[in-house]
Amino acid sequence: MPEFISLLQQASENRALLLEQLHAEETNCYRLFHGTNEGVAGLTVDRYGPQLLIQSFHESLTEQRLEQIQQHYAELFSAEEVVYNDRSASNSRRQDAQDRRGQQFVGQELGVNYRVKGKHSGQDPFLFLDMRVGRRYVLEHAKNRSVLNLFSYTCGVGICAAMAGARQTINVDFAERNLAIGKENAELNDLTDEQIAFIQSDFFTAAKQFAGIPVKQRVRRGQKPRQFPRLEEQQFDLVYLDPPRWAKSHFGTVDLIRDYPSVLKPSLLATREGGTLVCTNNVAKVPMDEWVSVVKRCAEKAGRPIHDIEFLTPEADFPSPDGQPPLKIAVLHL
């Protein structure tokens, strides 16, 4: 058996028990091959409902390699569409309009429906599969609670909160197209406007207003100040903070390596006393212990000491032999 086929086979065997569990939990979205830790760095293979998504980040795949992948996973499920996204350096931005249209499908995770589409105007899938453990946590803990989902992207966490019976769910994201997918996800699960809300806003303006912190912005000479949605101060029972590695706006800079407190402090202050803040850091080179130390110091300085902390680890379709997954998730009980 060729070495590459052997690696795919081993990955499938390693997932057998997990996939049995996920299928029983009404889940058909998961990672099939996590190349970084399964023998082929830069290659990922995911199932999104009826779609097989293949992505390469280091080098383009040959037709033979693509055919081998398709044949191997045809034994698991009959894909209605196979999508290959070449995200290696020379091809990551080369995508014509025809490619971007793609087909739309519905995938399921833990009984919740999500819009899935392999080719679209952005690069990332609509649903980040390694965050399943976080969405699972929200499904189990959001009932009868007020929930704020920051950097909500396509609102998976917020959808889970509403499905769990949260008494209030608010999703905040700067990108209108992300929230549009979130609204589709809400419709796919028959959620009403009373159950879930969407706010298009910069993180800093929304989080600071909820936290009761004055909003400041950088304004160049001759320019008018940027407008932003006006929100009432409010604290939430459960806040979910999942920021990108780096982003800059007129209201602040997100930098998970050098300045995590800039996003953490307003999130802490928007969480009520006795509430829960779930926060993440997806930068692989930031060690867990260093990040946790920063989180604890920030909480103390903000006057919101952490009474207890627990950690969520991505599930077994994202293996991490050294026990240090890039995605770090901390649940802070305040």
Feature-to-residue mapping (PLM):
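Conserved class I S-adenosyl-L-methionine
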Residues: 144-153
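Non-catalytic substrate-recognition/targeting regions of SAM-dependent transferases
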Residues: 38-39, 43-46, 62-129, 136
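Mobile active-site "lid"/loop adjacent to the S-adenosyl-L-methionine
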Residues: 178, 221-266
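Conserved SAM-binding motif I beta-strand of class I
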Residues: 168-173
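Conserved SAM-binding loop of SAM-dependent methyltransferases across substrates and taxa
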Residues: 154-167
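C-terminal catalytic and target-recognition region of SAM-dependent MTase-like enzymes
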Residues: 235, 276-334
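Non-catalytic accessory regions of SAM-dependent methyltransferases
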Residues: 1-49
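S-adenosyl-L-methionine
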Residues: 175-238
